[in-house]
Swiss-Prot record:
It is found in: Cell membrane. There are 3 contiguous domains conserved in the CDPK subfamily: a kinase domain, an autoinhibitory (junction) domain and a calmodulin-like domain. The autoinhibitory domain (321-351) inactivates kinase activity under calcium-free conditions. Signal peptide: none annotated. Ca(2+) 1 binds at D371, T375, K377, E382. This is Calcium-dependent protein kinase 8. Residues 358-394, 395-430, 431-466, 467-502 form the EF-hand domain. Residues 1-21 are annotated as: Disordered.
Length: 533
């Protein structure tokens, strides 16, 4: 559920002292009751440590932010030990799916055994306004940042990282947990020491599974998504695919499946054509390429298991892997990939902060208006008529049908209130680029209609080394397409929309968007495996 741990230099611009959590002004029937008969009170955790976190911990400065909440540095009052506390605002949990994600994340962290490469859960609290997850503090920074900071990046270093990631996958699968969102950003170093352990930090999309069980919910990050996820029938093999994508990026600096649009990314994943021609692949060992091929095998039945990857000769002989530099090109690509992700994330965070209570205001009234028969459900015709009456922009019937099918979780051909909330939030964000303008304005502090290099540097001062002028210059060089030394709104929008949809500030939107895309590709026949009829 977002970055749970600290990044170096994140103190700048942070809030200090104990945070004040405002009361929650919005509850809906999508939420569960506390059984007290006192109205709708959202209860998330099954067995929290307690209700008042301040009795055991002091919350300090902010160290991170995600879609659902804020992560603070916190101190155990008795021992003085430092931890990270992820405080998830209940008003941001708009649907039953959001609630279940948080509940399951805590249950999975409790279930997982202590492991040197998995962030450990300390406590979990729940009060009327928020869920507070106290966990191990990681202050060593992100995986790619550490790689870029090193002067000499080699295949041997990549092999050591991959061994750690696969050991995490193996322990997860051994304990019946499918991660579903493996990506470089979800691995942090415990501290800044050269010998620091690399740790998996985010189980927000993870799920329990049984052998042979199939899943159809489309979740994850587009670049790392396995083809069978898009086909809506998958199992734990998806984690091997995602780790294979990470390996490819570690070795050459760019993702293996990339396009300017979500549909293009999805189609590239389905085609699964791996490019080993670009630099530095001619210098990469054949055993490394062999492992990439076997991890990015499009047929999950033929894909290696975590144990088989760990037994592969490239991993087994990691200390003997080539120690020759993969070149400055790879480091430069990794730096650009990492920092550009951070710029997008910062913009997405601004957008997400505008998708709070006001986004769902009026949704209940709209549902009641459309539900003319008072059945607690609305069908496609009622949805279409209601949207027209509310002045919603015209949506083609086929798109509306796809959206409705994606949101209709119980498959009864109608939308209940919880399902309607998801559709409404989706439509509000789909309507225009208002939120993208808000994000641009956040960076454009002097309101000149351009993001200048000083504004870019200021916006990223807790994301990158403030002395790293080359990083800021690289972003400006990449985004500033007309080379006038500043970023216009059009250039900013193009950057945000390249490769993945900026509107995935909302996880619910992401799910609905990819469900719709999957259905579209199914109808076009694009999701068939090679050789299928």
């Amino acid at each position: 559920m977002g970055n749970c741990c600290a990044s170096p230099g994140s103190e700048t611009g942070s809030k200090k002292g104990k945070p004040k959590i405002k009361s929650n002004p919005f509850y809906s029937e999508a939420y569960t009751t506390n059984g007290s008969g006192t109205g709708f009170k959202l209860s998330v955790l099954k067995d929290p440590t307690g209700h008042d976190i301040s009795l055991m911990y002091d919350l300090g400065r902010e160290v991170g932010r995600g879609e659902f909440g804020i992560t603070y540095l916190c101190t155990d009052i008795k021992t003085g030990e430092k931890y990270a506390c992820k405080s998830i605002s209940k008003k941001k949990l708009r649907t039953a799916v959001d609630i279940e994600d948080v509940r399951r994340e805590v249950e999975i962290m409790k279930h997982m055994p202590r492991h040197p490469n998995i962030v450990s859960l300390k406590d979990a609290f729940e009060d009327d306004d928020a869920v507070h997850i106290v966990m191990e503090l990681c202050e060593g920074g992100e995986l790619f940042d550490r790689i870029v900071a090193r002067g000499h990046y080699t295949e041997r270093a990549a092999a050591a990282v991959m061994k750690t990631i696969l050991e995490v996958v193996q322990i997860c699968h051994k304990h019946g947990v499918m991660h579903r969102d493996l990506k470089p950003e979800n691995f942090l170093f415990a501290n800044k020491k050269e010998t620091s352990a690399l740790k998996a930090i985010d189980f927000g999309l993870s799920v329990f599974f049984k052998p042979g069980e199939g899943f159809n919910e489309i979740v994850g990050s587009p670049y790392y998504m396995a083809p069978e996820v898009l086909r809506r029938n998958y199992g734990p093999e998806v984690d091997i695919w995602s780790a294979g994508v990470i390996l490819y990026i570690l070795l050459c600096g760019v993702p293996p499946f990339w396009a300017e649009t979500e549909q293009g990314v999805a189609q590239a994943i389905i085609r699964s054509v791996i490019d080993f021609k670009r630099d530095p692949w001619p210098r990469v060992s054949e055993t490394a390429k062999d492992l990439v091929r076997k991890m990015l095998e499009p047929d999950p039945k033929k894909r290696l298991s975590a144990a088989q990857v760990l037994e592969h000769s490239w991993i087994q002989n990691a200390k003997k892997a080539p120690n020759v530099s993969l070149g400055e090109t790879v480091k430069a690509r990794l730096k650009q990939f990492s920092v550009m992700n951070k710029l997008k994330k910062r913009a997405l965070r601004v957008i997400a902060e505008h998708l709070s209570v006001e986004e769902v205001a009026g949704i209940k009234e709209a549902f009641e208006m459309m539900d003319s028969k008072k059945t607690g459900k609305i069908n496609l015709e009622e949805l279409k008529f209601g949207l027209h009456k509310l002045g919603q922009q015209q949506i083609p019937d086929t798109d509306l049908q796809i959206l409705m099918e994606a949101a209709d979780v119980d498959g009864d051909g109608t939308l209940n209130y919880g399902e309607f909330v998801a559709v409404s939030v989706h439509l509000k964000k789909m309507a225009n680029d208002e939120h993208l303008h808000k994000a641009f304005s956040f960076f454009d502090q002097n309101q000149s209609d351009y993001i200048e290099i000083e504004e870019l540097r200021e916006a990223l001062n807790d994301e990158v080394d403030t002395n790293s002028e080359e990083v800021v210059a690289a972003i400006m060089q990449d985004v500033d397409t007309d080379k006038d030394g500043r970023i216009s709104y059009e250039e900013f929008a193009a950057m945000m929309k390249a490769g993945t949809d900026w509107r995935k500030a909302s996880r619910q939107y992401s799910r609905e968007r990819f469900n719709s895309l999957s259905l579209k590709l199914m109808r076009e026949g694009s999701l068939q495996l090679e050789g299928e009829n």
